[in-house]
């Protein structure tokens, strides 16, 4: 086991704080509409230019081990805020730095760190209660666009794209972000339920231009096993042919004689059919088949449900207005399922989301809700170069998360103003003793810091602006984009309540831990062998020419 070095008390804390400051100073230059870019070196490929706080934080590793511990703790603040709210990472970093900086002064003066932390926690709880009071729900598409624009560093086109996507697929819909292939941003919306399985034979294609198979007003047969014997399918095929409508078969697989017969009947125009594999695997496949059954008003023909292919009737088949089957995707548009059954299914999946333990499971369940309740929108980010697209894509991701947070918990005035109003509301808060009062003061001072940093990045005098904003009430604040004072909600400078709340909670949590730290244990630096010693350059033995 490698030897460890241990550092105690003030020396440990001061070096941890140095690490906090190095990371925070690199991250906080990105805050606000006039924040600066940071260039990140890559070990391969071209450098990345970003204004995304968490992207900057994740790149930072310091050579001094103790400083690096401090930096990693603040990196944790940014990462946790990003995971929970998707935005607000720079605000969280700025708040953490301010709490650590102010707290360090009190600890050095001999105050009890544990009481300081209790005071900090008390002030943060009160601040969050006040935040909830001034929060208001997002109701309009315009407000959603404004939140997205602020999060995307003032780029209105991104805000409009995201608002349009939410309009099209609903608040439950899935919105994904991809690299585009043109200079402009594009929005693609898939209405209905889409899954990632295509036709099993290209002979099913009936739209040669688009290379897809289109079925109008089809029946949908859902089966959880392989189909290889055509005799199993004949009874239901005859019933569908009599009805004079096309048929989509979704099964574990369709192969051999069964697939060949379907293709021949399709080519001859006897019965228009398309066969596709069922999406997913294992239990997830069963769940997805059940989703499609509920959406189309059919049943999954399976041994578990007591149904068999040979005895299947039209009553057990699903129906839809239109189905498009491509090489890799199948889209079911306007399924004939009962809306009450669909709502009940969505409710059931939402319960599973709340109980899910892994992010992967939660994401897949959320996708299923979206496909049943709304649709899928894809924002394709355009740009002239790969670097530009990557930087813009980061901002679109931030904006998307911010809008989801705004829909979830509402909005507050942006530009650091909400925290100033919170500070005014809790300024009379008292702790159980003088040391706890000092902890409350630390938070009160830290609440000013995001506004101070936004103003500093805009090239103005922070103290003057903070004093003027503090004199105002409600939504009155400083718009760093225009350099003017006014009602920030009216001028569209908004922050999601969830983002501000999460940033404050995470910052105070990690900063409080740092202040109560009294020792660090880390790997001791390795001694490098001196020249001429064994293992070093010039070691004994025959010389080699290089």
Swiss-Prot record:
Asked if the Swiss-Prot or TrEMBL record annotates the protein with the keyword rRNA-binding, the reply is: no
The UniProt entry's GO CC annotations, sorted and at most eight, read: cytoplasm
Q: What is its EC number?
A: 5.6.1.7
| Source organism (scientific name) | Paraburkholderia xenovorans (strain LB400)
Keywords from UniProt, A to Z, are: ATP-binding, Chaperone, Cytoplasm, Isomerase, Nucleotide-binding
Write out the function statement from the record: Together with its co-chaperonin GroES, plays an essential role in assisting protein folding. The GroEL-GroES system forms a nano-cage that allows encapsulation of the non-native substrate proteins and provides a physical environment optimized to promote and accelerate protein folding.
The entry's protein name is Chaperonin GroEL 4
Reactions this protein catalyses: ATP + H2O + a folded polypeptide = ADP + phosphate + an unfolded polypeptide
Residues covered by region (Disordered): 524-546
- Where, per UniProt, does this protein localize? Cytoplasm
| Subunit structure, interactors included | Forms a cylinder of 14 subunits composed of two heptameric rings stacked back-to-back. Interacts with the co-chaperonin GroES.
Q: Does the keyword Ubl conjugation apply?
A: no
Q: Which GO terms describe its molecular function?
A: ATP binding; ATP-dependent protein folding chaperone; isomerase activity; unfolded protein binding
PANTHER family linked to this entry? 60 KDA HEAT SHOCK PROTEIN, MITOCHONDRIAL (PTHR45633)
Bias (Gly residues): 533-546
Q: Where does ATP bind?
A: 30-33, 51, 87-91, 415, 495
Q: Which InterPro entries does the UniProt record give?
A: Chaperonin_Cpn60_CS, Cpn60/GroEL, Cpn60/GroEL/TCP-1, GroEL-like_apical_dom_sf, GROEL-like_equatorial_sf, TCP-1-like_intermed_sf
One biological process term in Gene Ontology: protein refolding
Top-level EC class, please?
isomerase
What protein family does this chain belong to?
Answer: Belongs to the chaperonin (HSP60) family.
Q: Which SUPFAM superfamilies match?
A: GroEL apical domain-like, GroEL equatorial domain-like, GroEL-intermediate domain like
